[in-house]
Amino acid sequence: KMIDAIIKRDEELKTRPISAIVVAPGCLPKAFPKEDGASMVRVEMAYGKCYAALALGRDSSLVKVRHEESPSFTSFLIKTSGGKLFPEGGGMQIRDSDGEVIGAIGVTGDTETVDQELALHGIRSAGLKTDADFEGKGRKFAIRRTKAEDGR
């Protein structure tokens, strides 16, 4: 359902051809279509965004900010993950109504902003939640933001 909604929205926005992937906890792929015309390694890039989101417990766009602030930190994580972690926006954790992380979604193919919008659209279309829905709801759901992420 999430992937279908993403592809439909992608067609409405007339974006570049995309790849999207939904993974279970542990980053086990569940669905990963690649639109005709999407360039090589798009599925791997979308997977890397999911990996980043699950590995650090935050949207991959925030992992990108962390990478810009401290390249040595994320370089270590990229190396430790065997190159699986991709610190670019478009990967989001998927949460159920209780806030439990039940997987992640990654989208790639257009701008970071569009990829992020499509990932969010997919999650919302399935009636599921994101990290943002649980901000300020206690330590279990806490996402500690850096100064740059807070806009300070």
Spans of model-derived segments:
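Flexible, solvent-exposed loop/hinge segments and secondary-structure transition points
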Residues: 1-152
